[in-house]
From Swiss-Prot:
Parts of the chain on the Extracellular side: 1-24, 75-98, 157-193, 255-267
Protein's organism: Homo sapiens
Protein name stated in the entry: Olfactory receptor 9A2
GO cellular component, one term: plasma membrane
Keyword terms, alphabetized: Cell membrane, G-protein coupled receptor, Glycoprotein, Membrane, Olfaction, Receptor, Sensory transduction, Transducer, Transmembrane, Transmembrane helix
Cytoplasmic side stretches: 46-53, 117-135, 214-233, 289-310
Matches recorded under InterPro entries: GPCR_Rhodpsn, GPCR_Rhodpsn_7TM, Olfact_rcpt, Olfact_rcpt_6C-like
Residues carrying sugar: N4
PANTHER family found in the cross-reference section: OLFACTORY RECEPTOR, OLFACTORY RECEPTOR 6C76
Keyword Transmembrane annotated: yes
Length: 310
């Protein structure tokens, strides 16, 4: 019996079903999404760093969010593309799982911070620069990054304590923790319950300040007498609100459920939304609805064209 078990740290990812032709089509689609994600988020990081008009807490947090989007998609998509070309691949458990979930935790922490930032900007504008000063912003970002990495210490340790089937075939395109638990030969009920509580704490814990902030923001905006004033105020947080709905909605379906080993195809679809579609959409959401970012992009393109002409 013991010959069929192992404490594996490497797994064979089965990826997506279907013919080789379908895999090539999926490869082209996901490769395009990946390139646009990298370029879009990199552009946001660069213009926030170089354009003085974007030297504010909101865009400082946005640049870190874009950095996390690049990390999340780079952790998952290249391995997924490799699997589509070569019909499955091997992936190391510790590095992939820890980085993936750490980045996700940091992203939700930043979304909560950005909601509070918008609350201060809309509801307490006269004290905005005092409350959201540079030291506060830097410390908030540092805490978010550190918390993201620390939150994965116990889950990774607990996962390494399990023994797995020697086949090590994982029916997913990345090391999904729910599917890892499904491969375990041990009783994972307690670990699943603790992971469920951790997911609730991280997702709901960062969602509460977001909901409270938006409640105050909307109530404040509705008191503005002019329609143009209300539209301008709503535009300051519309892009963030869109990201919150997409990010929290998909992850609540994916992680906040007591039984993590159910619904393989369902998990794959929602995982694609989290790891591919959301990072792809975020640059467009934050640029198309933000006049300052669009102006900075136009000016940057003009400067680049001028340099090429010279």
């Amino acid at each position: 019996m013991m010959d069929n078990h192992s404490s594996a740290t490497e797994f064979h990812l089965l990826g997506f079903p279907g013919s080789q032709g379908l895999h090539h089509i999926l490869f082209a689609i996901f490769f395009f999404f990946y390139l646009v994600t990298l370029m879009g988020n990199t552009v946001i990081i660069v213009i926030v760093c170089v354009d003085k008009r974007l030297q504010s807490p909101m865009y400082f947090f946005l640049s870190h969010l874009s950095t996390l989007e690049i990390l999340v998609t780079t952790i998952i998509v290249p391995m997924m593309l490799w699997g589509l070309l070569f019909l499955g691949c091997r992936q190391y458990l510790s590095l992939h799982v820890s980085l993936n979930f750490s980045c996700g935790t940091m992203e939700f922490a930043l979304l909560g911070v950005m909601a509070v930032d918008r609350y201060v900007a809309v509801c307490n504008p006269l004290r905005y620069n005092i409350i959201m000063n540079s030291s506060t912003c830097i410390w908030v970002v540092i805490v978010s990054w550190v918390f993201g990495f620390l939150s994965e210490i116990w889950p990774i340790y607990a996962t390494f304590q399990f023994t797995f089937r020697k086949s090590n075939s994982l029916d997913h395109f990345y090391c999904d923790r729910g599917q890892l638990l499904k491969l375990s030969c041990d009783n994972t009920l307690l670990t699943e319950f603790i992971l469920f509580l951790m997911a609730v704490f991280i997702l709901i814990g960062s969602l509460i300040p977001t909901i409270v902030s938006y409640t105050y923001i909307i109530s404040t905006i509705l008191k503005i007498p002019s329609a143009s004033g209300r539209r301008k105020a709503f535009s300051t947080f519309a892009s963030h609100f869109t990201c919150v709905v997409i990010g929290y909605g998909s992850c609540l379906f994916l992680y906040v459920k007591p039984k993590q080993t159910q619904g393989v195809e369902y998990n794959k679809i929602v995982s694609l939304l989290v790891s591919v579609l959301t990072p792809f959409l975020n640059p467009f959401i934050f640029t198309l609805r933000n006049d300052k970012v669009k102006e900075a992009l136009r000016d940057g393109m003009k400067r680049c064209c001028q340099l090429l002409k010279d």
